[in-house]
Amino acid sequence: YEGTTGIQALDLLGRKVLLGTRGKCVRDFSRIMLRSAKAHWLAHGSIGRMARSTAKRAIEWNLVTLRIMRRVGKDRDLVGSASVDYLMYSGYVMMAHFWVRQAAVAQTFLRNGKGAESAEFYRAKIQTAEFYFDRLLPRADAHRKSALAPTRSLMQMGNGDFAFS
């Protein structure tokens, strides 16, 4: 990636997560995620499943961050190679948190009938959250794996290897 995505990714991982807070920003937000998920993880059905998945992702996000922090001192290419995948991974994980919160509120309004919107709106909100967890959130796994991949394959080509006669 080049341009905006690459720059924002380098800023997130390099400046904000690693240098600025030594991972504290991730620990703080994932603590919020866990607290929110805990309120629903024993629920039956999709809300409980989504809450448990969110809790797992919050813990995993901390582990991914810690693994990068431990390797970065020995591998100067790691921040550049991991940053875009780390950005994408973080985005998917954070959105899981917001989707499960929205779905839980929608379920409450469906049950008590006190929401300002129609029942169809709240059902659609829950269905959209289910779609996110089933179809989009699994993409985070590939980004996690790529962010943690060795940099050797990325950096092994020399400058001369890019010139063909």
Residue ranges and their predicted role:
Residues Y1-G20, K24-C25:
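Catalytic phosphate/nucleotide-handling subdomain of diverse soluble enzymes
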Residues A9-L13, I32, M95:
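Generic recognition of well-ordered alpha-helical segments
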Residues K16-G20, R35-S165:
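C-terminal amphipathic alpha-helical interaction region
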Residues G23, D28-R35:
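Active-site or pore-adjacent capping/gating segments
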